Regions:
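Class I S-adenosyl-L-methionine-dependent methyltransferase catalytic core
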Residues: 1-137
Length: 137
């Protein structure tokens, strides 16, 4: 995206260096202008490097990409680490096998889920209802 999560992280922890991924070229170009940011590969799902103690993400929602990303991020999370991701609400209610499997998996890893009201991200140009998924490994 346009760095909203990065800016929020830097407001709380100004000296932290954030490693990030971004698919869209115009957003990648913008992210290069931010301080304390290391822009990694374009596609998180194709990069197998790195394990992290903290992961904060807003993955793409379409085609259940959000839940696929959450599971991949969990694999990259170090023991004792924390993952926080903004996701769609689709997986919470959908009857697709992938969504059912994700709900069951979240229970297994003791994931916490918080509803985010529609309009909460209006400043970023969206009014869609979302969820926050938080998992401690």
């Amino acid at each position: 995206g346009r760095g909203a999560l990065i800016k929020a992280i830097h407001r709380a922890c100004p000296s932290v260096t954030v490693e990030c991924y971004e698919l869209m070229p115009e957003n990648r170009e913008f992210l290069h202008t931010l301080n304390n940011v290391i822009l990694l590969d374009e596609d998180f799902t194709k990069d197998s490097v790195g394990h992290y103690t903290k992961i904060i993400a807003n993955p793409p929602f379409s085609g259940n990409q959000d839940i696929e990303h959450v599971r991949l991020m969990y694999d990259r999370l170090e023991e004792g680490g924390t993952l926080a991701a903004i996701t769609s609400q689709h997986w919470k209610f959908a009857s697709e096998k992938k969504c059912i499997d994700f709900r069951n998996w979240l229970k297994e890893v003791h994931g916490e889920v918080f509803e985010i009201s529609a309009g909460e991200f209006k400043e970023s140009g969206t009014t869609v209802s979302t969820m926050a998924v938080v998992i401690k490994k």
